[in-house]
């Protein structure tokens, strides 16, 4: 059992003075940096801002801190910035380096610990959630078992891919049956 504040730190970002309603939802030559808000569609990245004055983040975890989606948690593997009603946290150990699979596991663990616990009047701000605990697998000597995390996420990915292939094969078989019966 680990407190979030013992594993992560909130990232300070420059304040950007844009209204989401004035920002494009499609990237162009100037407005090309995805901007994080409290939404859950597209991992909260629904608008674009210029790079100028923005704090560019990548390979961090974002957390929605407002509205109906407060506590929604995503691993952000691509460049983005924080616009409003959300924030980003970074891992403070192992030289701040984790693999994508490790980030996915930690994001799921954080989501399980906080999503649905907070609400409009009790927002999931960092000062509140940093005391929440997450459960992580440990090695025999009490360290976080990153090898197990890698293995588990790889196994889950393989199962998902297998199920998608099986589903697709069934759909193809149904389609072929309809075609064969009608032509």
Where are the predicted features?
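Non-catalytic DNA-recognition/assembly elements of restriction-modification systems
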Residues: 1-42, 139-183
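DNA target-recognition domains and sequence-specific DNA-contacting regions of bacterial/archaeal
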Residues: 5-133
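A short, hydrophobic, proline-anchored segment that marks a local hinge/packing element in signaling
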Residues: 135-137
